């Protein structure tokens, strides 16, 4: 059996990294479907998607400077497109305050990209330019993996994993593993190093999910539904669950239920 060379292994892990990264980019689809159904982005944050967009844009530039980094180009080109889609959906359904905040972040992001690219291209050359952009990419990638920290804090505070899907945490961990080995065999420190932290953050997120995954369900059973019990003529207990977020609608629903009970006597 022929022994695989480092180039072969880097290609294999890069290809696997593309596949898993593709799934990572698509993992928030259920979240945005929920936003679409609710017609509201309240409770969700755009920051992780903004940071991911910035990272994908910088990595495209880094791949251009390194040459022959087609596997980095392919996935980050797709990443830019999908993150822009997510951010657009978020802005469409976000409350006014969130729209303004996200808009300022977008302007800041575009301004940062507009500074990094021309400055490094004009003021640095060759390997020195690659090194500068590589360090910037490494720092941003660390921020990408650290972005869910705010969501992790929210999970601990609310004891709910609603805003931290398990599939996203799982694929982030797998993604970090694949790209670490790609960078390792490619001898690309700027790709390998951030993914060590990415792997660790992913493990912590999955542990938090298993710790708190049943907490919200228990809390809901204890406090959220308005439960009223009454007895029919036959002595059978009838439970009326009202889970409407709007209190007026809940009261109207309760009145209708009791009306049905009265007319059935």
From Swiss-Prot:
Disruption phenotype: 'Early open anther' phenotype; anther opening in young flower buds that contain immature pollen, resulting in poor pollen quality and impaired pollen release. It holds the Pfam family MtN3_slv. Keywords: Cell membrane, Membrane, Repeat, Sugar transport, Transmembrane, Transmembrane helix, Transport. Mediates both low-affinity uptake and efflux of sugar across the plasma membrane. Promotes the formation of phloem bundles in mid-veins. Probably involved in the development of stomium cells that control anther opening time. Required for pollen viability. One of its GO terms (molecular function) is sugar transmembrane transporter activity. GO terms for biological process: anther dehiscence; pollen development. It is a multi-pass membrane protein. Highly expressed in nectary tissue and weakly in the stamen, especially in stomium cells and in the upper part of the filaments. It comes from the Eukaryota. The lineage of its organism: Eukaryota, Viridiplantae, Streptophyta, Embryophyta, Tracheophyta. The chain crosses the membrane at residues 9-29, 45-65, 72-92, 104-124, 131-151, 165-185, 191-211. Residues 11-97, 132-216 form the MtN3/slv domain. Belongs to the SWEET sugar transporter family. Gene3D superfamilies: 1.20.1280.290. GO terms for cellular component: plasma membrane. InterPro entries: SWEET, SWEET_rpt. This is Bidirectional sugar transporter NEC1. Forms homooligomers and/or heterooligomers. The keyword Cell membrane applies.
């Amino acid at each position: 059996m022929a022994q695989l060379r480092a180039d072969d292994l880097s290609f294999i892990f890069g290809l696997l990294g593309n596949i898993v990264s593709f799934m990572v980019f698509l993992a928030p689809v259920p979240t945005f479907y929920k936003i679409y159904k609710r017609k509201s982005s309240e409770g969700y944050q755009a920051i992780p998607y903004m940071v991911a967009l910035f990272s994908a844009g910088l990595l495209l530039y880094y791949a251009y400077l390194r040459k022959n980094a087609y596997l980095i180009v392919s996935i980050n080109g797709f990443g830019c497109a999908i993150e822009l889609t997510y951010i657009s959906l978020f802005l469409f359904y976000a409350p006014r305050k969130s729209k303004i905040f996200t808009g300022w972040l977008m302007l800041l992001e575009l301004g940062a990209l507009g500074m990094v690219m021309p400055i490094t291209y004009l003021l640095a050359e060759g390997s020195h330019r690659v090194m500068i952009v590589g360090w910037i990419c490494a720092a941003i990638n660390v921020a990408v993996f650290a972005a869910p920290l705010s969501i992790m804090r929210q999970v601990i505070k609310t004891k709910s994993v609603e805003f931290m899907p398990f599939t996203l945490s799982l694929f982030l961990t797998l993604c970090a593993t694949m790209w670490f080995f790609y960078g390792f065999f490619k001898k690309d420190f700027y790709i390998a190093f951030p993914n060590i932290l990415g792997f660790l953050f992913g493990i912590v997120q999955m542990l938090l999910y298993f710790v708190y995954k049943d907490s919200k369900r228990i809390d809901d059973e204890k406090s959220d539904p308005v439960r009223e019990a009454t007895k029919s003529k036959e002595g059978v207990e009838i439970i009326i669950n009202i889970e409407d977020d709007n209190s007026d609608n809940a009261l109207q629903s309760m009145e209708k239920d009791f009306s049905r009970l009265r007319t059935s006597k």
